[in-house]
Amino acid sequence: TPLKESTCYLPKETGPCVGYFFRYY
């Protein structure tokens, strides 16, 4: 079942934590 988890990554410019990826188990 694919679980949608949130991940934090910092872009080249300073910004908030954004980003998503699907993790399969």
From Swiss-Prot:
**Sorted alphabetically, which InterPro entries does this protein's record hold?**
Kunitz_BPTI_sf
Where do the BPTI/Kunitz inhibitor domain residues begin and end? 7-25
The domain of life is: Eukaryota
Residues under site feature: Reactive bond: 18-19
A Gene Ontology molecular-function term? serine-type endopeptidase inhibitor activity
Q: What is its main location?
A: secreted
One cellular component GO annotation, for this chain's record?
extracellular region
Q: What keywords sit in the KW lines?
A: Protease inhibitor, Secreted, Serine protease inhibitor
Location comes to: Secreted
What does the UniProt function comment say about this protein?
Answer: Inhibits trypsin, human plasma kallikrein and human neutrophil elastase.
Q: What is this protein called?
A: Kunitz-type serine protease inhibitor 4
Supply the source organism for this entry: Rhipicephalus microplus (Cattle tick)
